[in-house]
Amino acid sequence: MVRRDRLRRMREWWVQVGLLAVPLLAAYLHIPPPQLSPALHSWKTSGKFFTYKGLRIFYQDSVGVVGSPEIVVLLHGFPTSSYDWYKIWEGLTLRFHRVIALDFLGFGFSDKPRPHQYSIFEQASIVESLLRHLGLQNRRINLLSHDYGDIVAQELLYRYKQNRSGRLTIKSLCLSNGGIFPETHRPLLLQKLLKDGGVLSPILTRLMNFFVFSRGLTPVFGPYTRPTESELWDMWAGIRNNDGNLVIDSLLQYINQRKKFRRRWVGALASVTIPIHFIYGPLDPINPYPEFLELYRKTLPRSTVSILDDHISHYPQLEDPMGFLNAYMGFINSF
């Protein structure tokens, strides 16, 4: 009898917990995205949108040096956006006539359709479509990329090498801290869980919040160059815009694509004759030193490399904008 009463009370207790948990969970899952900071709001309002196959793609296009024919297109990393380039933007306008950046599909202020099979091939096609939209499809383009953007740049380079219809005419390529080699890439634990999580992935993406995001991203910055809380909120606001946290698992399929198409993408880097450079933050836990750099130099002996200070990590353009900009300008002025 006593045991039966105890079981009944336990059942009642769990029912009460459930009744409390359901509305709390519902409220949590419907937390609105954070408001944009004045700086991020300014970035959005100064940009524009174009349409790719019915989807809105955000981009920035600044006119810089008058009379210069030079154009640079910036390709951002995962999981952030074109806002990653804001610290070097003005410096680039002092050297280039056009400075252009976009938010890839599923990132930043661009549309984030779901369900959707996100792919590096589609992102490369979006870059080509943007340049056609701007009337620059026949101009020689300098590509500057980071992380995820490095893989998109590799596909653009492959199309250029194959002389594909609609391809960009690439003048130069500068990569930075991207996992261009699957064998030296060390994804974060959360990335591993999300890309292979199956039925678990949709649950994890819905439970992701600022605390989880910031604790996951901060370690990929150097110890002296970590973002402030307000900077992390800007990154998180870009992700939460258009419910972007719900497509992170789909976007992460690029890791599997990179393994599948390694020969195509690494081969494109190794076989072209345009100037190629790599800017490297050596403390990067995702592309660790010296394994990554040794393989890079072995695979691409013609490429030049700039190694930043020892404490610079995975986001060199944010951690050391002046060092990054100087390294890039040194490369651009070398040919």
From Swiss-Prot:
Identification of the protein by name: Mesoderm-specific transcript homolog protein
Transmembrane intervals: 13-33, 63-83, 266-286
Subcellular localization(s) per the UniProt record: Endoplasmic reticulum membrane
Positions occupied by motif RVIALD: 98-103
Gene Ontology biological process terms, A to Z: regulation of lipid storage; response to retinoic acid
Keyword Hydrolase: yes
UniProt KW keywords: Endoplasmic reticulum, Glycoprotein, Hydrolase, Membrane, Transmembrane, Transmembrane helix
Molecular functions per Gene Ontology: hydrolase activity
Classification via InterPro entries: AB_hydrolase_1, AB_hydrolase_fold, AB_hydrolase_sf, Epox_hydrolase-like
Database matches in PANTHER family: HYDROLASE, PUTATIVE (AFU_ORTHOLOGUE AFUA_2G14860)-RELATED (PTHR43798:SF33), MONOACYLGLYCEROL LIPASE (PTHR43798)
